[in-house]
Amino acid sequence: MAKKALINKAAAKPKFKVRGYTRCQRCGRPRSVFRKFGLCRVCFREMAHAGELPGVSKSSW
């Protein structure tokens, strides 16, 4: 889990646009966040396996 101060800092609008960054909405992780879902890869995988993300299925080829 990310520190609350860092989550609040990321939520605030930065002075310059390029300083803004995405964080996982569930755990606050700053890296590897899917913009479409707003989740990091770890949370995305957990929720997909639990069937909590509609329209997401495991691919196989």
UniProtKB/Swiss-Prot annotation:
A molecular function GO annotation: structural constituent of ribosome
Regions that span the bilayer: none
Sites where the protein binds Zn(2+): C24, C27, C40, C43
GO cellular component: cytoplasm; small ribosomal subunit
Pfam family, one: Ribosomal_S14
Cofactors, names only: Zn(2+)
GO biological process: translation
InterPro entries the UniProt entry points to: Ribosomal_uS14, Ribosomal_uS14_bact, Ribosomal_uS14_CS, Ribosomal_uS14_sf
CC cofactor note: Binds 1 zinc ion per subunit.
Sections of the chain in a coiled coil: none
Keywords: Metal-binding, Ribonucleoprotein, Ribosomal protein, RNA-binding, rRNA-binding, Zinc
Subunit structure: Part of the 30S ribosomal subunit. Contacts proteins S3 and S10.
Matches recorded under PANTHER family: 30S RIBOSOMAL PROTEIN S14 (PTHR19836), SMALL RIBOSOMAL SUBUNIT PROTEIN US14M (PTHR19836:SF19)
Classification via HAMAP family: Ribosomal_uS14_2_B
Similarity remark: Belongs to the universal ribosomal protein uS14 family. Zinc-binding uS14 subfamily.
The protein's role, per its UniProt record: Binds 16S rRNA, required for the assembly of 30S particles and may also be responsible for determining the conformation of the 16S rRNA at the A site.
Listed name of the protein: Small ribosomal subunit protein uS14B
Encoding gene, per UniProt annotation: rpsZ
